[in-house]
Amino acid sequence: MLDLNLKIFSSYNEDQDRKVPLMISTTGEEESNSSSSSTTDSAARDAFIAFGILKRDDDLVPPPPPPPHKETGDLFPVVADARRNIEFSVEDSHWLNLSSLQRNTQKMVKKSRRGPRSRSSQYRGVTFYRRTGRWESHIWDCGKQVYLGGFDTAYAAARAYDRAAIKFRGLDADINFVVDDYRHDIDKMKNLNKVEFVQTLRRESASFGRGSSKYKGLALQKCTQFKTHDQIHLFQNRGWDAAAIKYNELGKGEGAMKFGAHIKGNGHNDLELSLGISSSSESIKLTTGDYYKGINRSTMGLYGKQSSIFLPMATMKPLKTVAASSGFPFISMTSSSSSMSNCFDP
């Protein structure tokens, strides 16, 4: 194998070699066995190129050194080092912040599992049921779901959930509104245990849903009137009748009606069930329905007066007689109260 690498031999310096013409000499097969492959002319002092077949290291000339590399540096290397240190410190602090953020997110996830937000409501612990058409509130306690009541609005159900969450889990519980809104309720919660508090919420939701009144036996109907369960008005307590008259249309904008059984100095204290209205004028006549209702609906101008009106006992008839004359069947009723037993004739 022949090594055809070109080798440059020169007796001058490197600067002079660039100015001297070159002569190429080749060696044939006859001179391959000789010890030298090329000769130089000392008089001409010319350089020549030869094939390095014999690879003589003595005649080899090292290549010229490469040109010096130009390096550029900052005018203020100290500032650059400071910037590097700042970058490293920022990266370290950012890494620490990431770890702290991850821990905080994990804590928040664990805390939100107590009361997950409902899909059907924007409030926590509130769910809308299409079957009933109401918003129901629930809370988890000791692995069980506690029913807090059904409400007509999501806001009322959310308020009930917040109060239950504060009662069960304290002031740090996840609620829908601000804790300061329940300062008045917190004072009442201290005197009640969990069972009593849940029963209180359920009672409020039941009365709110049915439109009940603060009076016993009254409920708000669709016609926006408070009516009783018994239209004959056979009640043991006259407060029920007072509430019915107060909240009906005939009682709107009128003065408070007084009943003869509760006024001192009235001689008709034995008035039990049938409540009527009478005036000084004899032209007003009571109908059969007035004995049942206790009100003469035909005289609308009567309510413009602010004076107290009573039904005299002389004009009243027993309920049994009125029922017989009007054609309505009379059903006798028994009660443990003495006031109820005295109302009917034997």
Curated annotation (Swiss-Prot):
One of its GO terms (molecular function) is DNA-binding transcription factor activity. It comes from the Eukaryota. 'Schlafmuetze' means 'nightcap' in German. It is found in: Nucleus. The keyword Transcription regulation applies. CDD domains: AP2. Probably acts as a transcriptional activator. Binds to the GCC-box pathogenesis-related promoter element. May be involved in the regulation of gene expression by stress factors and by components of stress signal transduction pathways. Repressor of flowering. GO terms for cellular component: nucleus. InterPro entries: AP2/ERF_dom (IPR001471), AP2/ERF_dom_sf (IPR036955), DNA-bd_dom_sf (IPR016177). Its main location: nucleus. Induction: Repressed by miR172 after photoperiod changement. Residues 122-178 bind DNA. SMART domains: AP2. Keywords: Activator, DNA-binding, Ethylene signaling pathway, Nucleus, Transcription, Transcription regulation. Pfam families: AP2 (PF00847). GO terms for biological process: chloroplast organization; ethylene-activated signaling pathway. This is AP2-like ethylene-responsive transcription factor SMZ. Belongs to the AP2/ERF transcription factor family. AP2 subfamily.
